[in-house]
């Protein structure tokens, strides 16, 4: 019988650890998210350092298709402060998302419907890898947002009444 080493066990435990680095609460308010997928991102070294320091902003980000690839556009990752300007990255550059071909086809078919778009939701560490959760969503109208706010306030009131 083969014996598993302690190193393998430690690495398996590290893969289950999640650390949230950036969250797009604005997208959850603006869009009605119907489907989510976890994707990897193609990053430069200075981008990884900045993201680990919490210097990423997903608020205005969205995804686009080009040559059977999904690109992450308009996501701001601040330049790393301890690196010279020659070696630093462009904060708003387009970044390729790493997905399987079937997942790309599925996302593309779901966004062909009118009003559907792909937005980044969360940026987090999974083990030592930086992952991004993207979601397919449809933009909410003003009255939809108001209804959501009413439902949240009703839930808050019910929970506070139950705690008493």
Swiss-Prot record:
Keywords: Cytoplasm, RNA-binding
Gene3D superfamilies listed in its UniProt record: 2.40.280.10
Entries under Pfam families matching the protein: SmpB (PF01668)
Main location: cytoplasm
Biased composition (Basic and acidic residues): 145-158
Gene Ontology MF terms in the entry: RNA binding
Example GO BP: trans-translation
Role this protein plays: Required for rescue of stalled ribosomes mediated by trans-translation. Binds to transfer-messenger RNA (tmRNA), required for stable association of tmRNA with ribosomes. tmRNA and SmpB together mimic tRNA shape, replacing the anticodon stem-loop with SmpB. tmRNA is encoded by the ssrA gene; the 2 termini fold to resemble tRNA(Ala) and it encodes a 'tag peptide', a short internal open reading frame. During trans-translation Ala-aminoacylated tmRNA acts like a tRNA, entering the A-site of stalled ribosomes, displacing the stalled mRNA.
Family named by the database record: Belongs to the SmpB family.
Protein name: SsrA-binding protein
